[in-house]
């Protein structure tokens, strides 16, 4: 019997859909799932396709041509380690494991090192696009040994999303680079979603827009600079009616946002690297505070503040101001995310190509947006650009739109409407463009109570003052 070209372990939604995607591009596939009933179920769905079901790890490994290419689609963490351990006795030198799960990049770095000692290649691969993307074409971010990537590259390119005929996948860098970039992608996604939700809140609470009007506004925004998957689906969300009440479905959804922790990982890494990531971090905190529903309801009856009074005049001008505020904040958020990737690349010697990363984000993934082309062009102009805000294209926009962001935040603050990520974006912009910040006082305080020393503006050296004298 001929051997299959690639194997997939794990037949939950993402694994199943990736297996079908791979087969649809002309590759033969073996599958294995810990529970055989899942395998049977999948084989029924894949009837007539070039897919072989296996019922033990040994049978699965033996069904594959060498060097074996195995895609792991199991739960991140201990389940991935357990699966790798069960595979190892059956693998041979130069076999390739591809981890397509939502894995923490430090776990990928560890596994890469451990498996290299056994002669096994390990490719930690970020996959974005959800259930539909897995089936029709996701954005794929592989990291690991470059020579191993060359062997799986034809498969990854074939199954990825395409934009202008270009595959939305590229070699990201060594060891944990692929999963790191996917993690930052998810952090940017948190920022995008929070900024959109704050825009919605202002339009609904302060401007009093109905669901139908909100649909029209977001659909119109999606035709211009904000053209993106998240704006597109937001416009669609406002058209959906609840079958039970007849109300817009969004109005009966509980305001408690869930999360899987990847936004938190992004913020933790930024803290470790000493990189400012306020918008994304504020977006993570916003989800935390949203989860405190009972406490917030109690506080709403005890703590006073401005009463929201819908604005009735100059609505069109204010809607345009919110659009500009959203786009400027989005630029600041991406600037922070790409600056974090730059810091990580320098820390871990990954040599990330930021323009290429922007290009593969254009299709298949959740943050896909037209303006990613502009990010790519910015890095074409200056491959080692310190911050996107310093690129001429983005500099001109933020300078032009900052007035709108200030106006929208002022309006929200006056009405008592929380806009933590908008406020964070403006504070970041103002801090970044300020040559002299009040950190001199912080250094004086640190030296006062802890003798932590300080530097001076007028001469070289490290200084300490006896403040109590």
From Swiss-Prot:
NADP(+) binds at residues 10-15, 33-35, 74-76, 102. Substrate binds at residues 102, 128-130, 185-186, 190, 260, 287, 446, 452. Disruption phenotype: Cells lacking this gene exhibit a reduced growth on glucose as the sole carbon source, and they do not use the pentose phosphate (PP) pathway at all. Keywords: Gluconate utilization, NADP, Oxidoreductase, Pentose shunt. GO terms for molecular function: NADP binding; phosphogluconate dehydrogenase (decarboxylating) activity. The keyword NADP applies. GO terms for cellular component: cytosol. Its EC number is 1.1.1.44. It catalyses: 6-phospho-D-gluconate + NADP(+) = D-ribulose 5-phosphate + CO2 + NADPH. It is an enzyme of class 1 (oxidoreductase). InterPro entries: 6-PGluconate_DH-like_C_sf (IPR008927), 6PGD_dom2 (IPR013328), 6PGDH_C (IPR006114), 6PGDH_Gnd/GntZ (IPR006113), 6PGDH_NADP-bd (IPR006115), 6PGdom_BS (IPR006184), NAD(P)-bd_dom_sf (IPR036291), Pgluconate_DH (IPR006183). GO terms for biological process: D-gluconate metabolic process; organic acid catabolic process; pentose-phosphate shunt, oxidative branch. The active site is at residues 182, 189. Pathway: Carbohydrate degradation; pentose phosphate pathway; D-ribulose 5-phosphate from D-glucose 6-phosphate (oxidative stage): step 3/3. Pfam families: 6PGD (PF00393), NAD_binding_2 (PF03446). Homodimer. Catalyzes the oxidative decarboxylation of 6-phosphogluconate to ribulose 5-phosphate and CO(2), with concomitant reduction of NADP to NADPH. Is the predominant 6-P-gluconate dehydrogenase isoenzyme in B.subtilis during growth on glucose and gluconate. NCBIfam families: gnd (TIGR00873), PRK09287.1 (NF006765). Belongs to the 6-phosphogluconate dehydrogenase family. This is 6-phosphogluconate dehydrogenase, NADP(+)-dependent, decarboxylating. It comes from Bacillus subtilis (strain 168). The gene is gndA.
């Amino acid at each position: 019997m001929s051997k299959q070209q690639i194997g997939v372990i794990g037949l939950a939604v993402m694994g199943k859909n990736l297996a079908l995607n791979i087969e649809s591009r002309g590759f033969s596939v073996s599958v294995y799932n810990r529970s055989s009933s899942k395998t049977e179920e999948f084989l029924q769905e894949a009837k007539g396709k070039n897919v072989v079901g296996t019922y033990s790890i040994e049978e699965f490994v033996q069904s594959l041509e060498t060097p074996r290419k195995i895609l792991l689609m199991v739960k991140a963490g201990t389940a991935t380690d357990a699966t790798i351990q069960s595979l190892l006795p059956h693998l041979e030198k130069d076999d390739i494991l591809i981890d397509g799960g939502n894995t923490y990049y430090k776990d990928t770095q560890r596994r890469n090192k451990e498996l290299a000692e056994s002669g096994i290649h390990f490719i930690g691969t970020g996959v974005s696009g959800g259930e539909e993307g897995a089936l029709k074409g996701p954005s794929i971010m592989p990291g690991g040994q470059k020579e191993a990537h060359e062997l799986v590259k034809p498969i990854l390119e074939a199954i990825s999303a395409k934009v202008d005929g270009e595959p939305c996948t590229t070699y990201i860098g060594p060891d944990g680079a692929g999963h790191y970039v996917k993690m930052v992608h998810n952090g940017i996604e948190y920022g995008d979603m929070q900024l959109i939700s704050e825009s919605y809140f202002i339009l609904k609470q302060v401007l009093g827009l109905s669901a139908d009007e909100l649909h029209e506004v977001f659909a119109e925004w999606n035709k211009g600079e904000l053209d993106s998957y998240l704006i597109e689906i937001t416009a669609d969300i406002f058209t959906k009616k609840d079958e039970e009440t007849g109300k817009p479905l969004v109005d009966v959804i509980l305001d408690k946002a869930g999360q899987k922790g990847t936004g938190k990982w992004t913020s933790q890494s930024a803290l470790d690297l000493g990189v400012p990531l306020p918008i994304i971090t504020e977006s993570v905190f916003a989800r935390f505070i949203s989860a405190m529903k009972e406490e917030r309801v109690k506080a709403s009856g005890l703590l006073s503040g401005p009463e929201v009074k819908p604005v009735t005049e100059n609505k069109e001008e204010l809607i345009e101001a919110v659009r500009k505020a959203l786009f400027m904040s989005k630029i600041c958020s991406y600037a922070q995310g790409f600056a974090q990737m730059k810091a990580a690349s320098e820390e871990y010697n990954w040599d990330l190509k930021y323009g290429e990363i922007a290009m593969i984000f254009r299709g298949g993934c959740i943050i896909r947006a037209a303006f990613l082309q502009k990010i790519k062009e910015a890095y074409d102009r200056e491959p080692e650009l310190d911050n996107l805000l310093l690129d001429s294209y983005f500099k001109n926009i933020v300078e032009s739109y900052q007035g709108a962001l200030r106006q929208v935040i002022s309006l929200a603050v006056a009405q008592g409407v929380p806009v933590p990520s908008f406020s964070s974006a403006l504070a970041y912009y103002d801090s970044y463009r300020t040559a002299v910040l009040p950190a001199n006082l912080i250094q004086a305080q640190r030296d006062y109570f802890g003798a932590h020393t300080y530097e001076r503006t007028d001469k070289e050296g490290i200084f300490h003052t006896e403040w109590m004298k």
